[in-house]
A protein has these predicted regions:
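Basic, glycine/lysine-rich polyanion-binding surfaces/domains
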Residues: 1-99
Length: 100
């Protein structure tokens, strides 16, 4: 099978027992009902309602993948991490491991 790097895109993984509830509270789409191996478009907004990032959310049995513009991956991961608090969630940059 041939693989191609998605160099224009960044990929974040969001895993842990609270990942679904955490993303549902943070994003503009209904993540609670997103079935495994399905995807949805979603946005992440500031407290004032301004769009900070938009991405493709891909559900998997292990958690979720967020595909977004490569230059936004690190800042979004850092800022989303500020809202984890006591939730059992891990946010990781998967950019070096993703192939299609």
């Amino acid at each position: 099978m041939q693989r191609a790097r998605l160099s224009r895109y960044g990929l974040l993984s969001v895993t842990g027992p609270d990942a679904r509830a955490f993303l549902h509270a943070q994003l503009t789409n209904d993540i609670e009902h997103l079935a495994p191996d399905r995807w949805a478009l979603a946005g992440w907004c500031s407290a004032k309602g301004r769009l900070l990032a938009s991405f493709l959310v891909i559900a998997s049995p292990q958690g979720f993948l967020l595909q977004l513009a490569r230059d936004l991956a690190e800042p979004v991961a850092k800022r989303l991490g500020m809202f984890v608090l006591r939730a059992k969630v891990k946010i990781a940059d998967e950019i070096g491991r993703a192939h299609v």
